[in-house]
């Protein structure tokens, strides 16, 4: 049973001291077997209590049962106080009942006017020890706390929000059964490095090998294989990001959300930086290029209408993915195109792709740039991989 604190709200701000004569006067209104005593030192409020009680702090309050508290029908004061504790909600006392009627004395008497709102507040939940998760070769502690829950037979516990795993327990004290719910909190991961701090746990969790309360956390049998496949697929992506991160001077955030554009950039970065492999992709029907003054392309500027033309264009730019921006050299190779516009004055070239057109791209780290010739690019394209076929597998060298 919970202990309770009593709070009385009133407008007085000056302390008063009781006297024997004053108490005698007030106690004339007290029924037989009861007496009024000052509520606490310095207060001007007197509470009605049993005459034979030895408790230092006690008071009498009135309830009218049955009553509804937090959606539950309550029929006795013990359950009301218990439910107040379990829900961490105050009990607001009925002022009419406390003031007394039909000859009943008031439960509180103030020397300076009417007593205002009266409430009983529960004591806070105690702090709990963390729960321990275990798997072969590893362990993890998760802080938990008791959650207010409107029930006289069930207790709810949840993990603290800032953790890799969200855990929720619902204990039924009547039948001693426990309902357990767990979910991975991916928002806890800030960087790709954070993922690898918890990778061993996440892998064992996906395989149903983590123990909690001496039991395995298991996934439903009908989706267990799918969960494992999803973990393996995502794990390859995260490993690719870690490998890319090792090649650039930037920390990569953990991908909470991925756009198709992000995925495609990561694929090309992975094949270029890790596998040293050209990526083949589908180009737009029309390609526009603008060349600067230093370009020697104008020396062999093609004429409009020329067919079966190939073009190799390296240029420097910043690519953005997952809120990261990195400088690269992007090498583009297009085969079998037709010249639609060739503007020598503005140095603009517009090509149309043909049905046999092939398009290739290869990224280079701008800080480690080594110029690639068109012949080298043509040689590299022989081992090119289709963009859609990239699964973040590392080539054996």
UniProtKB/Swiss-Prot annotation:
Protein role: Confers resistance to phages by a mechanism of abortive infection. Seems to act by interfering with phage RNA synthesis. Does not act at the level of phage DNA synthesis.
Keywords: Plasmid
Domain of life per record: Bacteria
UniProt protein name: Abortive phage resistance protein AbiGii
Record Pfam families: AbiGii_2 (PF16873)
């Amino acid at each position: 049973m919970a202990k309770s604190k009593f709070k009385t709200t009133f407008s007085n701000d000056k302390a008063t001291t009781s006297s024997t004569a004053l108490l005698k006067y007030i106690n004339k209104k007290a029924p037989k077997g009861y007496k009024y005593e000052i509520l606490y030192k310095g207060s001007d409020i007197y509470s009605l209590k049993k005459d034979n009680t030895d408790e230092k702090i006690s008071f009498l309050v009135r309830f009218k049962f049955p009553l509804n508290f937090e959606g539950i029908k309550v029929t006795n004061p013990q359950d009301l106080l218990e439910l107040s504790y379990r829900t961490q909600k105050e009990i607001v006392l009925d002022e009419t009942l406390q003031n007394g009627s039909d000859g009943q004395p008031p439960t509180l008497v103030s020397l300076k006017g009417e007593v205002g709102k009266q409430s009983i507040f529960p004591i806070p939940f105690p702090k709990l020890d963390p729960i321990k998760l275990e798997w072969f070769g590893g362990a993890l502690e998760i802080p938990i706390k008791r959650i207010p829950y409107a029930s006289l037979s069930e207790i709810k516990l949840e993990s603290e929000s800032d953790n890799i795993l969200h855990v929720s327990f619902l204990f039924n004290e009547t039948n001693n059964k426990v309902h357990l719910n767990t979910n991975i909190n991916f928002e806890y991961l800030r960087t790709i490095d954070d993922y690898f701090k918890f990778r061993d746990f996440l892998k064992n969790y996906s395989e149903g090998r983590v123990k909690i309360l001496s039991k395995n956390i298991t996934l439903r049998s009908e989706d267990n294989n799918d969960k494992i496949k999803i973990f393996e697929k995502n794990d390859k992506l995260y490993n690719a990001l870690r490998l890319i991160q090792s090649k650039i001077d930037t920390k990569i955030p953990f991908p909470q959300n991925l756009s198709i554009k992000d995925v495609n950039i990561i694929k090309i970065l992975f094949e270029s930086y890790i596998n040293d492999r050209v990526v083949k992709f589908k180009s737009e029907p029309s390609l526009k290029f603008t060349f600067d003054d230093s370009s020697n392309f104008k020396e062999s500027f093609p004429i409009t209408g020329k067919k079966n033309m190939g073009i190799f264009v390296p240029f420097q730019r910043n690519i953005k993915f997952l809120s990261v921006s990195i400088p690269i050299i992007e090498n583009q190779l297009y085969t079998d195109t037709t010249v639609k516009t060739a503007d020598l004055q503005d140095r603009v070239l517009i090509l149309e792709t043909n049905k046999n057109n092939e398009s290739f791209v290869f990224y280079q780290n701008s800080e480690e740039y080594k110029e690639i010739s068109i012949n080298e690019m043509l040689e590299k394209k022989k081992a090119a991989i289709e963009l859609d076929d990239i699964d973040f597998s590392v080539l054996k060298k």
